[in-house]
Amino acid sequence: MKKDISIAPVPGRKWTIGIRYGSRIEQLRILPVKAVRITNEKHDSVMLSNPDCAPWCRTRLKMLVTSECTAGYALQPGSLVLKDAGGRMFEPGKDYEINEEYGTFMRTADGRIREGEPVFASYSFFHSRLDSIVLAEDGVIVQRLGDEDMATPAPPPVQPGEKLLANIYFSGHPDRISGDMIFPVLTNRLPVSPSQTELMPETVAKLKSGKKVRILVWGDSVTECSYLPEKEHYQTMFLKRLRSAYPKADIEMRTLGWGGRSTTTFLNEPPGSPYNFMEQVVAWEPDLVVSEFVNDGGYSPEMCEECYGTILDAFRGNGIEWLILTPHYIKLSWMGLTSQKNCSEDPRYLVRFLRKFGKENRIAVADGSLKYGHLWENGIPFMSYMVNTINHPDRRGMKLFADALIEAMTEN
């Protein structure tokens, strides 16, 4: 890991960073993301206040819309103004409720916004952006601007002769640069999952011999992945690489994903349900089940033991091998994190449990979490991979899963 670079905010200067690179010490003024002002954006109607409605599912400011949700913290606080067609201003807290984190709002039951009445919204917001600090070919350290995006900004390409030193992540509405926005590039590698072919002997033997192999990929919305093209699903990438690694392989792969659900949900589904565990997972008679459940992340130790123990008993009793994919990193507050840096150790009990459970029971574990936890060392904030700014990875995040799976399934 590189130790010859240090970048930090300069005290007393809102948008200036101090750079130590080798024997060089200098300062660089950073160009921040500018607010965008929207005037009189028409909304044909406003949802009635409902405390059970998720904050990102309410009436959405249109410029903040991402995949399925709205961009968290993109709205400039205090900037929203709602008016009727005649220009009369509505009062927040009285006529409507606003969630400034997600840029959504609802009309109150006793307010002046009527059912079906159009309203006109004016507000300011910020795009996300991932810039690069590079050592240019002429020896000058410069800021390269990335493309602005509401959810998944990508860093600019590094030109021939340039050296990438760090990335700067603009997200939300910062009023000055902070250390948490600066991602020095400490390495260009991610941890590799060890080969675990010995824990899936029957499946691997069939892959090598050309006998028919049935693989069931089982999970939640990340596995269902209705928000991305099929070619960008992790299991599609995994299948392509599996066939390349085992040229004789005859693979039948099926996906069973259910958005917003967990292992417990599947286990509790009644007979006849298209998501009943015994009928739709076990009875399909797969040789191998690949499981991914980020939605199990809030499970207690007792729930982990009960659910995963039940699944293991069913698989072992029916000759099914298992490859557990540890979950990706998600919205910081949902993980108990305060920064996307120095987060190599996943704080979720579920991940620690799955690693231990795999070792104790000789179950293969592909460690997707481990790769996400080290993105910061590569200069990448993991939230820049989330298309909904919460928990749905883009194609780059899906590739990390495919990497972890193929590493576990091959002799690396």
Predicted segments with their positions:
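Serine-dependent acyl-ester chemistry module
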Residues: R261, Y275-M278, S291-E305, I324, ...
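Serine-esterase "nucleophile elbow" of acetyl-processing enzymes
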Residues: P191-G257, N276-E285
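Short, well-structured alpha-helical segments in soluble
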Residues: N268-E285, E305-T310
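Acidic/histidine-rich helix-loop elements
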Residues: T255-G272, Y299, N342-C343, I390
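A short helix->loop->beta-strand "cap" motif at the edges of active sites that frequently abuts
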Residues: R316-W322, I363
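Extended beta-strand solenoid/passenger and fiber regions
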Residues: M1-A109, E115, F126-R129, V134, ...
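Catalytic His-Asp segment of secreted/periplasmic serine-dependent ester chemistry enzymes
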Residues: V192-L199, Y329-N412
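Non-catalytic propeptide/linker segments at domain boundaries
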Residues: P156, I168-G210
